[in-house]
């Protein structure tokens, strides 16, 4: 037996139900013909800002000599205390250079203070954001890893520093 009240209620709600259904279809069709905003990530990438702060790198001069003068300003200014530097004097010209330069990337907050504090632009944050690792120990960067990053990203880092020189 059909309940008369439920049958009456369904007829009363029919125009509203049709309205809501067609409104949803209209919205769906409208968005169907708009340009897509999602990217097929591994194949397509968004352009990065020139001020993006990614993986750290130590830079060298054109002759291959490292820029870091072991002033330890980056170590002192790091709010996360992620940087550890040990310095030693050279015998040739009595200038200081780093013996050990470590960054614990698990502590780093990517604030960019180390880059701003460096008087010789030795430590920079490059454009690389894809550096996932399988172990935590791989995120403990030593001097050789940082110098290697500097060699890989030197052109991109130079371009970014030139574009952003008025902001530093």
Curated annotation (Swiss-Prot):
Q: Where does [4Fe-4S] cluster 2 bind?
A: 78, 108, 111, 114
Q: What is the stated purpose of this protein?
A: NDH-1 shuttles electrons from NADH, via FMN and iron-sulfur (Fe-S) centers, to quinones in the respiratory chain. The immediate electron acceptor for the enzyme in this species is believed to be ubiquinone. Couples the redox reaction to proton translocation (for every two electrons transferred, four hydrogen ions are translocated across the cytoplasmic membrane), and thus conserves the redox energy in a proton gradient.
What this protein is called in its record is NADH-quinone oxidoreductase subunit I
Topology within the bilayer: Peripheral membrane protein
Q: Which cofactor does it need?
A: [4Fe-4S] cluster
The record's subcellular locations are: Cell inner membrane
What gene name does this entry carry? nuoI
Q: What UniProt keywords are attached to this protein's entry? A: 4Fe-4S, Cell inner membrane, Cell membrane, Iron, Iron-sulfur, Membrane, Metal-binding, NAD, Quinone, Repeat, Translocase, Ubiquinone
Subunit annotation: NDH-1 is composed of 14 different subunits. Subunits NuoA, H, J, K, L, M, N constitute the membrane sector of the complex.
User: Which PROSITE patterns did the record assign?
Assistant: 4FE4S_FER_1, 4FE4S_FER_2
Q: Which reaction does it catalyse?
A: a quinone + NADH + 5 H(+)(in) = a quinol + NAD(+) + 4 H(+)(out)
- Cellular component GO terms held in the UniProt record: plasma membrane
Q: Where does [4Fe-4S] cluster 1 bind?
A: 68, 71, 74, 118
> One Pfam family of this protein, by short name?
Fer4_7
The record's family statement is:
Belongs to the complex I 23 kDa subunit family.
One of the protein's GO biological processes:
aerobic respiration
Protein source organism? Ehrlichia ruminantium (strain Gardel)
Q: Which GO terms describe its molecular function?
A: 4 iron, 4 sulfur cluster binding; iron ion binding; NADH:ubiquinone reductase (non-electrogenic) activity; quinone binding
Positions of the 4Fe-4S ferredoxin-type domain: 58-88, 99-128
Cite the EC number: 7.1.1.-
Q: How is the cofactor bound?
A: Binds 2 [4Fe-4S] clusters per subunit.
């Amino acid at each position: 037996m059909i309940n008369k009240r439920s049958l009456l209620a369904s007829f009363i709600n029919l125009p509203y139900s049709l309205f809501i259904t067609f409104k949803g279809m209209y919205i769906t069709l409208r968005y169907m013909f708009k340009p897509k905003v999602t990217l097929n990530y591994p194949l397509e990438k968004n352009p990065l800002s020139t001020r993006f702060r990614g993986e750290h790198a130590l830079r060298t001069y054109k002759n291959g000599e490292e820029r870091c003068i072991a002033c330890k300003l980056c170590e002192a200014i790091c709010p996360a205390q992620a940087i550890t530097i040990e310095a030693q004097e050279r015998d040739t010209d009595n200038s200081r250079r780093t013996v050990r330069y470590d960054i614990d990337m698990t502590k780093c907050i990517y604030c960019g203070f180390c880059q701003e504090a460096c008087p010789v632009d030795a430590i920079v944050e490059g454009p690389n954001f894809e550096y996932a690792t399988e172990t935590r120990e791989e995120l403990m960067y030593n001097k050789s890893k940082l110098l290697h990053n500097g060699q890989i990203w030197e052109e991109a880092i130079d371009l970014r520093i030139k574009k952003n020189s008025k902001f530093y």
